[in-house]
Curated annotation (Swiss-Prot):
One of its GO terms (molecular function) is ribosomal small subunit binding. Pfam families: RBFA (PF02033). InterPro entries: KH_dom-like_a/b (IPR015946), RbfA (IPR000238), RbfA_dom_sf (IPR023799), Ribosome-bd_factorA_CS (IPR020053). This is Ribosome-binding factor A. It comes from Aeromonas hydrophila subsp. hydrophila (strain ATCC 7966 / DSM 30187 / BCRC 13018 / CCUG 14551 / JCM 1027 / KCTC 2358 / NCIMB 9240 / NCTC 8049). The gene is rbfA.
Amino acid sequence: MAREFSRTRRVGQQIQREIALILQREVKDPRIGMVTVSDVEVSRDLNYAKVYVTFLQLENDAERIKEGLKALTEAAGYIRSLLGSAMRLRVVPELRFFYDQTLVEGMRLSNLVTNTIREDKRRMAESGREEDDAAPDETTEDNA
């Protein structure tokens, strides 16, 4: 019977919290800037951890993201050593950093939906139809 939260998931959540604190308090590299640890996936044998991060910035600058990931990769050994002293694990996972695209993709999809709704309203206004006319009333009364 599978448990609701496996050990690897619990370890991943703890690693996420610890790395967030380490990045906030210990790592002083200006290339990293404001970074958020959005998720950590740990391998079943706890030897590797994929750390998904997002960078707080005004626009999505691919060069700054690449530079931030490079800085995190260079600091991975230091972060791993601090992680080892903060957590009681027999093996501290090797850290691999990845940029988390979900926030950017979510914003892109939200903008697409907003633009589609705006375009539909504009087309209805041009054709002289009201919003209420676009969807006929589907409610019927039952005489039962």
